[in-house]
Amino acid sequence: SYDYNLFIFIIFLFFSVDTILLVYITRYNIINDAMPVSNVVFLFSKFCSMVGIAIILVTIPMVLGVIIQLLKGHTDFNFSVYFIELYVLTLPGFIQMILLSFAVHLLVNNKFGGHGVSMIIWVCLFLLRSFGEMDYNLFFYFYTPNYRWSDMNGIGHFLEPQLWFNFYWISLGCLLIVIAFLFYQRGI
């Protein structure tokens, strides 16, 4: 799971800058800047495309897992567990990655500078969380409390804290996007 999340992070890091700065890379910005459409429409459509990629990348492990289980002869599927784990618990984390990556790239407005700043942020978060003495989930962006599945009651009482933390971090990511959007300049 950790390797797959690292792979997802790299995809979001590179695709987010390409979606934001593609009009400048392809020199389409002269036409794009003359369009009478708000910046919000352009950026929201790019964000929605990244969320669509996140949904596809969350669905792939479920489909492959079901296929592998079928090939091994297992037919007792628990799709509610798959749905909760992937779409309710994992997908919001991917959306948080997208929000932070978008905010950084909107503020930096440079392809490689945005990559560098994003990587520094994520490496610092990982190092502080892994080697530091702090285990405070409200301090580290994207982190949520641990949870366990059980056969008797599923995720049980662990679901509510997960939902609240995901709401908290997505709200902070939206705030970062709004702040970055205030500094975003179109036409330059």
Regions found by a protein language model. Give the residues of each.
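Secretory targeting signals
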Residues: S1-F14, F44-F112, R148-M152, F158-P161
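Hydrophobic alpha-helical transmembrane segments
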Residues: S1-Y24, V63, I179-I188
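Helix-loop-helix units of permease transmembrane domains in multi-pass membrane transporters
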Residues: V17-I53
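Transmembrane helix-loop junction
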Residues: L22, M35, V66-L70, L106, ...
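Gram-positive cell-envelope targeting signals
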Residues: N29, L43, I67, F83, ...
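Terminal transmembrane helical anchor/hairpin motif
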Residues: F112-G187
